[in-house]
Regions:
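RNase H-like nuclease fold core
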Residues: 184, 243-265
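Metal/cofactor- and membrane transport-associated sequence elements
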Residues: 1-77, 82-105
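Catalytic palm active-site di-aspartate
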Residues: 22-25, 45, 56-87, 100, ...
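Cytochrome P450 core scaffold surrounding the K-helix E-X-X-R motif
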Residues: 27-35, 255-260, 307
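Structured nucleic-acid-interacting core domains from mobile-element enzymes and related host factors
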Residues: 8-16, 224-248, 290-292
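RNase H-like nuclease module associated with reverse transcription
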Residues: 114, 205, 243, 264-396
Length: 396
């Protein structure tokens, strides 16, 4: 999904054509009742796109590139039977579609407006693409027969007391809790980064005997928050050039069960994961023709961690930390990353580590390019009045 969002960001900025195809022969039609051994089919190696001049990206095997010197770049993103095609060359787009339809039974869906449950809204004047999942939220509410009674400005209370509980298999399951958490997890992965921290808490208790009514109540609060922010979407693209930056944060003190890690140690682990993702994104953007002009900047709000990485200091309290977690320091020494300090209030990653007050939560959502849309049709399932959080200015 990260590759898909990055591709859409580049496509929106360049104002490329964005179309989709759906293959009809991906799965076998018969129902197998016996164990059958088969030889690998000739088409399994994927020679169709190679014959059309596409090469597989070394960064993501589902991304195929064709970068001729005389024609605009052409990108194809494949997910099982769904293909996303992006290029500025309309004649080449029609030719590739025709060749694919000759080799496979597929349906031309035209311009991309939905993908894997995501609604895609494009504003070519502003060169933006907005991703939403309001339809999926409505389906989840209908399937669970959920009716909200109170709109929420945040997905999780900043005073929550959810913590680890001993396993008690005699406790009856509190509703469809695992199913609900799974649905919310997919929303968070695709278009709702504001749900990352609440789901990191709720997902710890999906096992039978682990969740109690209070956990189900917390999950229902997330649903109320989704009702309040149903028309909000993730905005990609814009006219500014691509600048790759990252934010890392950790909050071991907010762990109500244990607080065993020091703040510096937790920040080192978080910095290593963020540096790894930035390093990978650098290669992905290079494949898409948007190689960063300077090393990406990783912002952290812990000065102790910054000192260990920048000054190559050795402290007796950090000797137990494996060297692999000092990836940020290694990349900085190579000139492939730059570490910088940022105040906690300006650290975007803070929303991923703790439950915030409504004003702080909304501010970080804005920093994540997560805005309210000027489209009230997604509120038809609920009240004719606009829900909380929708009456905001559409921002670029």
């Amino acid at each position: 999904m990260t590759t898909f969002r990055v591709l859409l960001h580049v496509v929106a900025q360049r104002d490329y054509e964005l179309h989709s195809l759906e293959l009809s022969t991906t799965f076998l039609q018969g129902s197998l009742h016996e164990e059958i051994w088969l030889r690998r089919s000739p088409g399994f190696t994927g020679t169709t796109l190679a014959a059309l001049g596409f090469a597989r990206s070394t960064t993501d095997p589902s991304l195929f590139l064709r970068t001729d010197t005389t024609l605009p770049p052409f990108y194809i993103l494949v997910y099982v039977d769904d293909l996303v095609l992006a290029t500025a060359y309309t004649a080449g787009l029609a030719h590739v579609k025709s060749e694919l339809q000759k080799r496979h039974t597929c349906t031309d869906l035209g311009e991309l407006c939905s993908y894997l449950g995501l609604q895609i809204t494009r504003d070519r004047a502003w060169r933006t693409i907005t991703l939403t999942q309001s339809h999926m939220v409505q389906q989840v509410l209908q399937r669970l027969n959920f009716t909200y009674s109170l709109l929420q400005a945040t997905p999780l209370s900043s005073r929550h007391s959810l913590s680890a509980l001993p396993l008690d298999e005699s406790v009856e399951p509190s509703g469809p809790y695992p199913e609900l958490v799974g649905c919310l997890m997919y929303l968070m992965t695709c278009t709702r980064p504001d749900l990352a921290y609440p789901l990191s808490i709720l997902a710890r208790y999906v096992a039978p005997g682990r969740h109690r009514p209070e956990h189900m109540d917390a999950a229902k609060r997330v649903l109320c928050y989704l009702c309040s922010t149903l028309c909000m979407g993730l905005v990609l693209g814009g006219r500014a050039r691509v600048v790759l930056t990252g934010h890392a944060d950790a909050s071991c003190v907010d762990d109500l069960a244990t607080q065993r890690s020091s703040s510096c140690e937790a920040e080192i682990y978080a910095g290593a994961m963020a540096a790894q993702e930035l390093h990978w994104l650098t290669y992905l953007l290079t494949d898409l023709g948007e190689a960063p002009r300077s090393p990406p900047v990783l912002y952290v709000d812990n000065k102790a961690m910054l000192a260990l990485c920048q000054e190559h200091r050795l402290e007796h309290r950090t000797k137990h930390i494996a060297l692999c977690y000092f990836l940020a320091r290694e990349l900085q020494q190579r000139g492939q990353l730059r570490l910088a300090y940022v105040a906690t209030r300006a650290n975007t990653a803070d929303i991923f580590t703790k439950a915030l007050q409504p004003c702080d939560h909304q501010r970080f959502c804005t920093m994540l390019a997560f805005f309210a849309l000027l489209d009230w049709s997604c509120d038809l399932l609920f009240s004719p009045t606009l829900p909380m959080g929708v009456c905001q200015t559409y921002m670029i």
